[in-house]
C-alpha cells in the first residue's frame, strides 16, 4: 500500500513538472513574440512624424511657389524623406512598415508627388493661375493624410498585439 502511494506521489510530481515545463516554454515563446512585435513597433513613431512632415512641407512648398519664392532645398528635402519612407535610405533612419495598406498609400502618394513637381515647374513657367497647382495640392494633402492614418493604424495594431501578449504572459505566470 505504501509502495502504491509512493508511486502515485512520484507520478503527480512528474505531471506537475511537465506542466511547469510547458508553462515556462509557453512563456518563453510569448516573450519572443513580444520582442518581435516591439522591434516592429520601434521606429513607427518616427515614420508617422516624417509622413506628417511631408504633408505640411508640401503645402509650404506650394505656397512658396504661388508667391514666386522658389525653394529647391525644400523639394530635395521632400524627395529625401519620401525616398526614406519608401526605401529606408537616406539619413533619416526610417524603418519599413510591413503593412500592405500603408505601402500602397505611400506609393500612390510618392507617384503623385512626381506629378506635383511637374506642376511646380509649370507654375514657374506660366504662373500659378494657369495651372492646377492648388487643386493638386489639395489632392496631395488628402493622400498624405491617408498615408499618415495608415501608419498610425499599423502602429495601433502592433500595440494591440503586444498588449494581448502581455495579458497572455501574465495569465501564464499565474498558472
Predicted regions and their residues:
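Alpha-helical coiled-coil oligomerization motifs
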Residues: 59, 66-69, 73, 86, ...
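Short, solvent-exposed segments of well-ordered alpha helices
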Residues: 16, 20, 38-52, 96, ...
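Juxtamembrane amphipathic/coiled-coil helical coupling segments that flank
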Residues: 128-172
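Extreme N-terminal signal-anchor transmembrane helix of membrane signaling/transducer proteins, especially
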Residues: 10-38, 170-175
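Heptad-repeat alpha-helical coiled-coil/4-helix-bundle sensor or tether segments in soluble regions
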Residues: 75-130, 136-139, 143-146
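Juxtamembrane membrane-water interface segments immediately C-terminal to a transmembrane helix
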Residues: 38-76, 158
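Short, Lys/Arg-rich, polar N-terminal cytosolic tail immediately upstream
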Residues: 1-10
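Hydrophobic alpha-helical transmembrane segments of multi-pass membrane proteins
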Residues: 24-31, 57, 61, 83-87
Amino acid at each position: 500500500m505504501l509502495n502504491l502511494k509512493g508511486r502515485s506521489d512520484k507520478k503527480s510530481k512528474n505531471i506537475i513538472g511537465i506542466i511547469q515545463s510547458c508553462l515556462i516554454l509557453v512563456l518563453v515563446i510569448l516573450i519572443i513574440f513580444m520582442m518581435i512585435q516591439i522591434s516592429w513597433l520601434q521606429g513607427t513613431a518616427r515614420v508617422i512624424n516624417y509622413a506628417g512632415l511631408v504633408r505640411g512641407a508640401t503645402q509650404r512648398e506650394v505656397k512658396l511657389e504661388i508667391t514666386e519664392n522658389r525653394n529647391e532645398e525644400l523639394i530635395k528635402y521632400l524627395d529625401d524623406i519620401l525616398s526614406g519612407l519608401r526605401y529606408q535610405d537616406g539619413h533619416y533612419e526610417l524603418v519599413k512598415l510591413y503593412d500592405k495598406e500603408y505601402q500602397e498609400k505611400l506609393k500612390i502618394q510618392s507617384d503623385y508627388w512626381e506629378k506635383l513637381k511637374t506642376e511646380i515647374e509649370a507654375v514657374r513657367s506660366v504662373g500659378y493661375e494657369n495651372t492646377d497647382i492648388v487643386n493638386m495640392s489639395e489632392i496631395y494633402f488628402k493622400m498624405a493624410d491617408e498615408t499618415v492614418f495608415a501608419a498610425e493604424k499599423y502602429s495601433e495594431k502592433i500595440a494591440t498585439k503586444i498588449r494581448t501578449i502581455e495579458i497572455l504572459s501574465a495569465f501564464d505566470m499565474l498558472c
